[in-house]
Amino acid sequence: MKKFVFLILFFCAAIGMKAQERLGLSGMYGIDREKKIVVATGRLLEGMKPYKESMNVAGETYSYYRSEMPLITITTDGPIVNSPAVHGVINVADADGNVITMHAGFKIRGTSSQQYDKKSYRVELWADETGAEMADTTFLGLRSDDDWNLEAMWAQPLRLRDKVANELWMEMYKLPYAESEPDALPGIRMVYADVFVNEEYMGVYALTERMDRKQLGLRKYNGDIRGVLYKGNGPGAPTFDSLPMYDNTLDTWDNYEWVYPNENDTAINWNHLYSFTNFVMNASDNVFYSQYAAQFDKDNAIDYYLFINSLMAMDNMGRNLFVARYKKSSTYMYLPWDLDAIWGLDTDGSMTYNTAGLMSNGFYDRLTQDCNDYGFVASAQTRYNELRDTLLNREHIMEMVQNQYDELLENGVYDREHEAWPDFTVDENQLTYLSNWLDDRFNYLDGEINAGCGTWGIEVPEPVEGPIRLVEVFPNPAKDRINICFAEDANAVVCLYDMTGRLVQSFAGQNQFLVIPTRNLSKGIYTLVSNVAGNQQVDRVVVE
């Protein structure tokens, strides 16, 4: 019976694709004739599991997948590029047969996505093919909106880190105005779906909401700026390392992007954020420690710091974060974004078993010196120990990861990813790697967070004297990365410290070559301490 249904679907698709109106496609299945893959969604009979069949059609063998995972098919008028958005039609189908078909504009999103074969996309829903007006709709139980992301998750070996981390954040943090805005969320929700683009099977994506005024429930612009939203895109003002003058005719300022209000150009005014940045960078200790909580929500600052450090998120203290304010009289708060370089992964998806060091920026560098009885450090210690018993522990996180992994495995996601992208293979050892990493990371944080105030992450390396070079470090100055070449393969630990003696990053490896990414580091002079086979070498490295 299954084969009969499949043959009907294939036959109809083969002879009727051109004759059908684009907005009349059923959307319940997709066919890739090059990769010989058919993916269909639909509610399975009770007790039935998702399955795969090999089928011979017209002398060719196709892989036929059937699951209850949603299916998204996209057809565009031309190739999808970074900008401008290209017109097309999107069909979003769930297993119950509900299909939503919309005109949309599509473009590639994300800087890193440009270099990968599997692209991430931004989807803007249009009222018609002109794109003159936007159109809201709700997909797969998510909010109603006209702006969506399709995340490729290319640099996530298990295709789950970003999703699980966002769910963990929303378990952990509640917006301070939640009672006034019950629909507001401090993060984004994500739903997995199979995706076809112009009849090419692209694998499994995460359809995600966007971080914006609607998601956060910020007060609307009414001629006066009330709720505001900025996005940090790198070092500079977002890391409190520079304070150039702003220009209110521009929607960017020193690696900040103005997100909301966006009703008109006259709504842009960087003065308030500039003043806060100036306060953090230049206020005296007495002024800073007595007044910072009146400008930035202290509970949010604590939760964000503990969350990012529990993940050891490599790229979320100046880049990939949002700064928001609910209304004019509210304090600022941080919200995370793009949580893929976490839990022992670098930004390119490679494993970096780095469990020591504290993620920070100029704001947190000062907060972690707040040694008052009810200051940041004391409050963060109390909050950390509460969370260790509930959410921030290996058992809870691995339960979330395992449940998500099992769901993806049962639905055949990893098999389909391999068919779409043959270089991809799932490695169950990644679960063991993550579990061990969490154990080591929390062991480190237990000692560090509960240490005396003013000591977090601070270690002073002792240089060794002698002419023998164990390690070659280049380039110096460095811009994007520091390359480290050891004389021979050996167990090595490399630690990078800033000028205050704070441990910024550490790496362990057994290879002859190691790369330390620096794009999220502030400009300045760093101390690189390499320990190889019981010997130590100290180098000064300039990051530009």
Predicted regions and their residues:
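Bacterial Sec-dependent N-terminal signal peptides
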Residues: 1-21, 485
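C-terminal outer-membrane/trafficking sorting elements
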Residues: 18, 465-474, 478-544
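Regulatory N- and C-terminal appendages and interdomain linkers associated
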Residues: 20-107, 395, 399-402, 407-457
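Short beta-strand/loop motifs in extracellular/secreted proteins, especially
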Residues: 88, 119-121, 490-495
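Conserved oxyanion/phosphate-binding beta-strand-loop segments in alpha/beta enzyme cores
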Residues: 92, 99-152
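Middle-to-C-terminal accessory/interaction subdomains
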Residues: 102-104, 110-112, 116-117, 262-318, ...
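Internal "kinase-insert"/substrate-recognition segments embedded within catalytic cores
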Residues: 127-132, 136-155, 159, 171, ...
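Residue-level detector of functionally pivotal "anchor" positions at catalytic/ligand-binding pockets or at interdomain
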Residues: 450-474
